[in-house]
Regions:
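Conserved beta-strand/loop scaffold segments within soluble protein domains that form the structured core
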Residues: 87-353, 363, 367, 371-405
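Residue-level "edge-of-site" marker
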Residues: 50, 361-362
Length: 405
């Protein structure tokens, strides 16, 4: 509870500063978040969705906390929450899980919210790129908030990237809320390429309307400790979601992906594919729950978690789950954990490929399926290059700076 008290005391010290720098919609949610956070504290591994995370240990170091509002020129269709339309502003904190302590801490301490609003019928021609660059002279915690509002029949690609430009310790607590109107289409990409001293808790909450489609891809290329949460509520008939993920981890890295796909109405489809390549002493975790509610007939759902362990010391925890309360459904789920195919290695070495290169090629081939599923061709091509560099160890040679490439 010491870490919990540390953040409560800090909030009480800076609440006036937060109020002066934020808009009314954000300030109105802080006290309720404080009450929930004070009552619950940081979740322990006994909390099912945090079973594989050491939350209190991650949040215990004495970080300085950034309290600066958004600055600089924003991309097209992007606004500060205070500058967004009133009907958009009221959606703040309307989709996120207000009972989750990590979300509540974000609600307490976030100074600003980046809004991406695509109006009705607009098809955004170029991807909207949101770059989060961690830089500072001291160990720093950053609370980030993003609200994406896709009006009816709108289309967009959004790329969120996390990079580190200095070698300090960083702790990121990010909450992304997505509201998708009827017939809207969104491809949302989350790419993490930081360093071993970075800890990230990212929570993405999506609410989909009728006939909407979401393609979400999470890629962890380099990190220290990452915990990604994805909750998707399919509340409009005919809505679809594809949620894919790719993890490359080595050294002492830890990556935990936790997903919930909630089929609340009939006639919806979901597909999940998460692949991990773990080397050295890396630890991976995947817990994916698909919930088919009563009355959600004609549901189609497929969930797969496949994992490649390149060493005997790497560890993977996998827990795909199906919870079905309807009878007219087609649902499947499964997971695999395996080591390098020695037969394939032998075959490649017989043809003149050295062992190191052969292992690299097998790792790349294993995760190609996730990269190739990305609809955005320019990003797909770029990620093939980044994955190759990552597997060759070229990204980790300058862990303090990820801006080149």
């Amino acid at each position: 509870m010491e870490a919990t008290r540390q953040y409560i005391d800090f909030y009480n010290e800076v609440r006036d500063v937060l109020a002066s720098r934020s808009c009314p919609e954000m300030n109105a949610c802080r006290e309720a978040a404080l009450q929930t956070f004070s009552r619950q504290g940081f979740p322990s591994p006994k909390v099912e969705r945090y079973r594989y995370a050491k939350v209190e240990a991650d949040f215990s170091p004495n970080y300085g906390i950034a309290l600066a509002p958004l600055g600089g020129q924003l991309p097209p269709h992007c606004f500060r929450l205070a500058e967004a339309e009133p009907r958009v502003r009221v959606l703040y904190n309307n989709v996120a899980d207000a009972t989750d302590s990590i979300v509540c801490l974000n609600t307490m301490l976030s100074v600003d919210t980046l809004v991406v609003h695509v109006p009705r019928g607009v098809k955004v021609e170029h991807p909207i790129q949101i770059s989060n660059i961690l830089k500072g002279e001291q160990d720093t915690m950053v609370c980030r908030r993003i609200l994406v509002v896709m009006d009816e029949l709108s289309e967009a690609d959004i790329i969120i990237t996390d990079r580190a430009a200095s070698q300090n310790r960083f702790l990121t607590n990010q909450v992304v809320e997505v509201v998708m109107g009827d017939g809207s289409h969104l491809s949302l990409y989350d790419i993490e390429e930081t360093h071993l001293l970075c800890t990230r808790y990212s929570s993405v909450f999506v609410r989909q309307g009728r006939d909407s489609s979401l393609h979400h891809t999470s890629l962890t290329l380099f990190n220290g400790h990452t915990r990604n949460r994805l909750d998707v509520l399919l509340q409009g008939e005919g809505s679809e979601v594809t949620a894919n993920g790719c993890v490359i981890a080595d050294k002492m890295q830890h990556v935990d992906n936790n997903t919930l796909i909630d089929h609340a109405v009939p006639g919806c489809q979901s597909s999940e594919l998460y692949k991990y390549v773990l080397d050295d002493n890396a630890v991976g975790a995947f817990a994916g729950r698909v919930l088919v509610r009563q009355g959600a007939q004609r549901t189609l759902s497929n969930e797969t978690n496949a994992n490649l362990l390149a060493t005997r010391s790497a560890r993977m925890y996998t827990q795909p789950m199906l919870e079905i309360y309807a009878d007219d459904v087609r649902c499947s789920h499964g997971s695999t954990v395996g080591q390098m195919d020695e037969t394939a290695l032998f075959y490649m070495r017989q043809r003149g490929i050295d062992e190191q290169e052969a292992r690299l090629l097998l790792k790349a081939a294993f995760i190609t399926e996730v990269i190739e599923s990305i609809p955005l061709e320019s990003l797909r091509d770029r990620l093939h290059v980044l994955v190759d560099k990552r597997l060759r160890g070229e990204l980790s040679k300058c862990e303090g700076c990820k801006l080149c490439g």
